């Protein structure tokens, strides 16, 4: 792996300051993968999101409605973490598939095995009234193939808009991946929010989380156009191809690979019920507890390709653009 010096990771899409056209050869690369990587990706993003709500005084006393939650193994860690902090949360986990048995028998967790529609969303809202709702959505439908089609995505995003409209949550974390430009159908609308990148996503995943906190006014919508899709594809490929394959040499941590650097900045914001001498000690404690929970082995930094020559990834001249590639970024989860 090549090396780089960075002050902070690209936490949000708007912070990505370069772009790169897709190279078809990337599809043949063997992806490095951790066990339970999908659960790790979800756990880190949701722990960061819920800790942010805790910081703003929004989390305590809320009901987390998680639609598309199965198998939900990682949710047990989230539940236990906030329970041990004394934060009062109820969980309603809804999916047409069955959940991990590790979630059975918890008084503050309700498991629902069904898919949602508008009628059922209205019944949830009535059932939970007047509780404040925090919505997490990981809905995903695939009618064929390895990835959802553009039709699938548009259907999912329309459903997520209905969720927001009916449930009227105080905050939400929604699944978000822009359709690829070469599969474009039509412009559409999504809720206004921050598009958060995800450490430990698959190598060329273009998926993010759309985070929003609502302050009482009507939901604001953002129009997504084909021009946005082109921009999104190039920036996400740059993030995945260039940035995520770096070792961060000025990052003092047992594993200096970029995804661990990204994880560090997420976990440093998380509250704990014990004190630590340094932020690094706290993050190590949290990482080890998460990896232990998910049975993920601890690894050290992969061997670098060259001697450490420090360079800034953010330099606009560091990547050649317009490589005349017509293929889209591929990788959804």
Swiss-Prot record:
The lineage of its organism: Viruses, Varidnaviria, Bamfordvirae, Nucleocytoviricota, Pokkesviricetes. It catalyses: a 5'-end (N(7)-methyl 5'-triphosphoguanosine)-ribonucleoside in mRNA + S-adenosyl-L-methionine = a 5'-end (N(7)-methyl 5'-triphosphoguanosine)-(2'-O-methyl-ribonucleoside) in mRNA + S-adenosyl-L-homocysteine + H(+). It is found in: Virion. GO terms for cellular component: virion component. Residues 169-249 are annotated as: Binding to NPH-I. GO terms for molecular function: mRNA (nucleoside-2'-O-)-methyltransferase activity. Interacts with poly(A) polymerase catalytic subunit OPG063. Interacts with OPG109 and OPG123; these interactions might help linking transcription to capping and polyadenylation. MRNA binds at residues 22, 177-180, 182, 205-207, 233. The active site is at 175 (for methyltransferase activity). It comes from the Viruses. Keywords: Elongation factor, Methyltransferase, mRNA capping, mRNA processing, Protein biosynthesis, S-adenosyl-L-methionine, Transcription, Transferase, Virion. Disulfide bonds: none annotated. GO terms for biological process: 7-methylguanosine mRNA capping; methylation; regulation of mRNA 3'-end processing. It comes from Variola virus (isolate Human/India/Ind3/1967) (VARV). This is Cap-specific mRNA (nucleoside-2'-O-)-methyltransferase. Its main location: virion. Gene3D superfamilies: Vaccinia Virus protein VP39. Signal peptide: none annotated.
